[in-house]
């Protein structure tokens, strides 16, 4: 692939992915994808939220595998040093934008949110006296938040003044009713007239006993809902940053990695096809001849296939991980692009402006880093 085409892909793949998500929503194709989204799912918890770790692990293993090999030249070593500098800059930017600028100082995305009027809400009940559907966005998170709020209010209940005792009783009773109800979104003991007062009381008590909740992490930890200001999309930022890093470093070693993969393509084909040669029916058919007993046939058809399949899978995994980790890198890259598409489709979590601010925040640094090192990124 020519340098110009790779530059175009590197520059446009993330914005085009977001645009495709918007078009899917506009033409009604995004509803099915939105129904499958789960912010508390295993994929989101173990893969997406730890995305920079997985990206760092795979990216650096590829850099080491294809550059720090026996017989590496001085140019290879310079490429590794340059990759480390780029990675360090992107890691610092990821941390200060999403985790925190300094001890006790929130990340940039939270500072933007607070500066634009956002804060940690506790609008637990809506005007109809029901648990607010927009409070946490899912039943699981809502129940977890209600349990946290209930624990804090119960712990500090003896500190209430006499005139607040009635509100405390109402709040505790309403939350208990929501947690214990079969339909937690419609507790019977919350009235419309009391909902606003209860929300205000919960908000004041949580901020009083838990301190100023000025970061999204603190707000989530104590059962609040981050709302009211401009909240740059952390998912868009992270997915874009990871894609830009993987594509940028792939340009350095991609030609060597793909050439190595092409040279050993038939070995990979044999390892893959070996996985399909271990089924019971196939094994039974290979047990032809009259000299084999029925017990031996059953042993070979039932016991041997899973053992043989596991051994073949282990050999394939070892071959990919040790000899061709670029396959893992490309798989991870597709995964992050898919997550970016899902984030663009999930318009209920962020506005278009918030998506764009997350996208631009990632491009500010990655664009400068890879534009500055454009000469050093010539594929080798």
From Swiss-Prot:
InterPro entries: FIT, SCS3. Residues 1-7, 65-88, 255-325, 378-380 are cytoplasmic. It is an enzyme of class 3 (hydrolase). Keywords: Endoplasmic reticulum, Hydrolase, Lipid biosynthesis, Lipid metabolism, Membrane, Phospholipid biosynthesis, Phospholipid metabolism, Transmembrane, Transmembrane helix. Residues 29-43, 110-233, 347-356 are lumenal. The chain crosses the membrane at residues 8-28, 44-64, 89-109, 234-254, 326-346, 357-377. Present with 538 molecules/cell in log phase SD medium. This is Acyl-coenzyme A diphosphatase SCS3. It comes from Saccharomyces cerevisiae (strain ATCC 204508 / S288c). The gene is SCS3.
């Amino acid at each position: 692939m020519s340098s110009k085409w790779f530059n175009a892909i590197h520059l446009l793949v993330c914005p085009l992915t977001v645009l495709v998500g918007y078009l899917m929503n506009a033409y009604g194709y995004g509803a099915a994808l939105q129904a499958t989204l789960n912010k508390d799912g295993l994929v989101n918890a173990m893969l997406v939220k730890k995305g920079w770790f997985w990206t760092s692990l795979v990216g650096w293993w590829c850099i080491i595998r294809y550059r720090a090999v026996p017989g590496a030249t001085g140019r290879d070593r310079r490429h590794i040093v340059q990759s480390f500098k780029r990675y360090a800059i992107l890691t610092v930017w990821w941390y200060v934008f999403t985790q925190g600028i300094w001890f006790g100082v929130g990340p940039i995305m939270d500072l933007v949110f607070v500066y634009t009027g956002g804060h940690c809400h506790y609008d637990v009940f809506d005007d109809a006296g029901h648990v607010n559907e927009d409070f946490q966005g899912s039943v699981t998170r809502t129940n977890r938040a209600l349990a946290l709020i209930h624990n804090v209010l119960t712990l500090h209940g003896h500190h209430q003044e006499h005139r607040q005792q009635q509100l405390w009783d109402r709040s505790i009773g309403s939350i208990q009713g929501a947690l214990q109800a079969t339909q937690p979104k419609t507790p019977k003991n919350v009235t419309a007239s009391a909902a606003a007062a209860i929300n205000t009381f919960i908000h004041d008590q949580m901020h009083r006993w838990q301190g100023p909740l000025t970061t999204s992490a603190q707000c989530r930890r104590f059962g609040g809902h981050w709302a009211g200001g401009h909240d740059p999309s952390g998912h868009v930022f992270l997915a874009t940053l990871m894609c830009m890093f993987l594509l940028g470093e792939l340009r350095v070693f991609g030609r060597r990695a793909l050439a190595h993969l092409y040279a050993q393509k038939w070995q990979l084909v044999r390892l893959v096809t070996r996985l399909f040669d271990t089924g019971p029916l196939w094994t039974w058919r290979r047990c032809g001849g009259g000299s084999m007993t029925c017990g031996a046939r059953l042993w070979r058809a039932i016991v041997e296939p899973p053992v043989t399949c596991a051994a073949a899978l282990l050999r394939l995994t070892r071959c990919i991980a040790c000899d061709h980790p670029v396959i893992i890198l490309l798989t991870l890259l597709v995964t992050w692009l898919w997550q970016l598409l899902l984030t663009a489709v999930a318009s209920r979590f962020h506005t278009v402006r918030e998506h764009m601010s997350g996208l631009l925040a990632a491009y500010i640094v990655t664009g400068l880093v890879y534009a500055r090192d454009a000469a050093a990124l010539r594929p080798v």
